């Protein structure tokens, strides 16, 4: 495979990786909807795994193949480049994920607080209703 076709293949994979990351983040954002959280989280996991594999297997490997095709003399040591690039991509993606998970956690906590308040209100109303009924029955017994 010549250098130009390697670069074209890398370009296609970068576009696919960006689209996959966008779909992954869209699924993560959609998971903020309490009712469809599990379904959207599984979509997010699938898309983020696909993104990681594209970056690691296609883009990084393609760049290494390209560099190797340009250096005919000796193989180039890519280990430090790969680790740095993987760390940067992982760090940036993880930062975005954590931000969304924090938002999701806040929404879940607010929803739980709301449900707890509604439950307490309902219990209070039922208690008041029972007290009124008891009071009315006492009044009827007095008469």
UniProtKB/Swiss-Prot annotation:
Keywords tagged on the record: Activator, Coiled coil, Developmental protein, Nucleus, Transcription, Transcription regulation
Pfam family name, one: Med11
GO cellular component: core mediator complex; mediator complex
Compositional bias (Basic and acidic residues): 111-136
Region (Disordered): 109-143
Principal cellular location given in the protein's record: nucleus
Quaternary structure, from the entry: Component of the Mediator complex.
UniProt similarity note: Belongs to the Mediator complex subunit 11 family.
Name assigned to this protein: Putative mediator of RNA polymerase II transcription subunit 11
Top-level taxonomy: Eukaryota, Amoebozoa, Evosea, Eumycetozoa, Dictyostelia
């Amino acid at each position: 495979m010549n250098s130009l076709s390697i670069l074209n293949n890398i370009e296609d994979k970068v576009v696919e990786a960006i689209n996959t990351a966008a779909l992954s983040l869209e699924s993560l954002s959609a998971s903020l909807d309490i009712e469809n959280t599990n379904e959207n989280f599984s979509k997010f996991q699938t898309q983020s795994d696909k993104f990681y594999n594209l970056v690691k297997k296609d883009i990084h490997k393609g760049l290494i193949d390209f560099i190797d095709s340009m250096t005919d003399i000796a193989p180039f040591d890519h280990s430090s480049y790969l680790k740095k690039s993987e760390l940067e991509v992982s760090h940036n993606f993880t930062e975005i994920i954590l931000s969304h998970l924090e938002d999701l956690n806040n929404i879940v906590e607010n929803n739980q607080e709301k449900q707890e308040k509604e439950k307490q209100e309902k219990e209070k109303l039922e208690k008041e209703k029972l007290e009124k009924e008891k009071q009315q029955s006492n009044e009827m017994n007095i008469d």
